[in-house]
């Protein structure tokens, strides 16, 4: 009887110590793969879901949409955007997949512009031109993130005066909303302390 009790206790202890498998998102992502530090700031994965069970996964590294699970014409849930499975992949395989682009989306000719009679020279990271805010644009920065409710995520990034050559301290906010009609509503807001240029967008590949 004593041996049976010992074995029973041992079995219970083993069961208690066995780690539970981490739950994945509907698109198969593990949140732990998005939890690390980049430039001293913590990254994470945030999941939005609506009443139709549409799921949108977003990381605050670059303000990126990582996956979008939405029903296809046959009602089957499919991931319809390109994205990586971890922060490390986004770092080691530089791309604009799903990213919030800033300060200035698209190309600035020769990386130069004049504002209020002041000439500015930006990094020329694309065949002699400045593309998507430079080599360290918003897509490679860590945003502050606040999950407002199950369907809304607020992302905030403050760029300092002179970052990537652009003038002015600027606070940029990106509000991502998953609506109940299966749409993603993205709203941009920027506040600066001196004349500057800003042109933000999202760079998802569908």
Task: Give names to the regions the model predicted.
Residues 2-8:
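Sec-dependent signal peptide recognition
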């Amino acid at each position: 009887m004593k041996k049976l009790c010992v074995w029973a206790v041992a079995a219970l202890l083993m069961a208690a110590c066995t780690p539970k498998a981490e739950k994945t998102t509907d698109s198969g992502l593990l949140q732990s793969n998005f939890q690390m530090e980049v430039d001293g700031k913590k990254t994470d994965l945030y999941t939005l879901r609506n009443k139709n069970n549409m799921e949108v996964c977003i990381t605050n590294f670059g303000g990126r949409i990582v996956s979008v699970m939405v029903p296809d014409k046959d009602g089957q849930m499919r991931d319809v955007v390109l994205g990586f499975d971890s922060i490390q992949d986004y770092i080691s395989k530089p791309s604009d997949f799903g990213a919030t682009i800033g300060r200035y989306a698209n190309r600035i000719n020769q990386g130069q512009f004049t504002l209020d009679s002041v000439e500015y020279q930006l990094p020329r990271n694309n065949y002699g031109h400045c593309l998507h805010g430079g080599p360290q644009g918003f897509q490679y920065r860590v945003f502050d993130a606040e999950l407002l409710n199950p369907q809304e995520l607020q992302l905030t990034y403050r760029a300092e005066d002179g970052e990537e050559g652009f003038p002015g301290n600027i606070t940029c906010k990106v509000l991502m909303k998953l609506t109940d009609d299966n749409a993603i509503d993205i709203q941009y807001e920027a506040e600066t302390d001196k004349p500057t240029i800003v042109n933000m967008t999202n760079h998802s590949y569908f």
